[in-house]
């Protein structure tokens, strides 16, 4: 009887504990810094987190971290993202993807580059992983949970990294949208027909989202230096010039949205609620990766 009471009390205490969240920022090849941090943690078997939120390259880094594949993300960044097949500006002139995410993620099916989704699902357990994506229709951030099924997980990662103009209209996620999206469930049926783009457009630093989901200690791995500020004025000027030339105003609208969302999150981190601790991890020097 005493043993049962003790177990019950322990369970209640565990439920009452505030969540610890890990957020991995995007940043393309700059994600190699995040990969290094997570690899160091894997060496120490360090994983105290309850909630994971990844944006763009950050979602790939978190997946390999949960898969316990030390060195995996670094190999992909060095091997695939620098391959001439991955980025070809000339493909855009032929109406094709400038950044070939299809080729990139097909490569992750090969034996020597395979993501261990089974281990990732097992190590995640009852915890929560959210992969951010931006709806091309309403331009809102969606926070999507992989089911553990390999193809679905891979498509979520692709959508989270699909930059407009570079990867055309985006990724269609039907039939994988469900009530786990952060937006109202009444919107899900409509969103079944939508395309999804890079999560960094609407949720570049989803710190506020982690807080709203109950995290009271939030660790953020950044891919820019501590003094970085979004240059929204510069993007506004670029948009004016590009619109006058008739060049991709929609893409620039996305960039402006990204800058504003970034500034909003920086402001939240600079002026956080009194009941949250936010820890940011930066590189000592500015990263020169693309």
What label would you give each PLM region?
Residues 1-55, 63-290:
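Patatin-like phospholipase
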């Amino acid at each position: 009887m005493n043993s049962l009471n003790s177990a019950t009390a322990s369970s209640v205490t565990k439920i009452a504990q505030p969540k610890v969240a890990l957020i991995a920022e995007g940043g393309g090849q700059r994600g190699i810094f995040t990969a290094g941090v997570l690899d160091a943690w894997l060496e120490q078997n360090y994983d105290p987190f309850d909630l994971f939120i990844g944006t763009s390259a950050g979602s790939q880094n978190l997946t390999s971290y949960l898969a316990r594949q030390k060195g995996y993300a670094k190999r992909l960044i060095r091997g695939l993202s620098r391959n001439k097949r991955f980025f070809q500006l000339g493909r855009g002139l032929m109406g094709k993807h400038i950044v070939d995410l299809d080729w990139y993620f097909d490569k992750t099916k090969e034996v020597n580059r395979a993501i261990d989704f089974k281990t990732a699902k097992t190590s995640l357990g009852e915890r929560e992983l959210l992969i951010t994506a931006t709806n091309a229709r309403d331009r809102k951030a969606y926070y999507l949970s992989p089911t553990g099924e390999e193809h679905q997980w891979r498509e979520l990662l692709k959508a989270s990294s699909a930059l407009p103009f570079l990867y055309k209209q985006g990724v269609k996620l039907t039939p994988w949208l469900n009530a786990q999206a952060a937006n109202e469930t009444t919107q899900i049926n409509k969103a079944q027909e939508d395309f999804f783009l890079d999560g960094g457009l609407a949720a570049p630093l989803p710190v506020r989202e982690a807080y709203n989901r109950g995290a009271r200690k939030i660790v953020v791995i950044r891919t820019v230096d501590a003094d970085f500020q979004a240059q929204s004025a510069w993007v506004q000027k670029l948009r004016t010039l590009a619109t006058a030339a008739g060049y991709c105003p929609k893409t620039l609208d996305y960039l402006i949205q990204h800058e504003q969302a970034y500034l909003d999150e920086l402001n939240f981190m600079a002026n956080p609620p009194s009941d949250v601790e936010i820890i940011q991890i930066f590189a000592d020097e500015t990263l020169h990766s693309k």
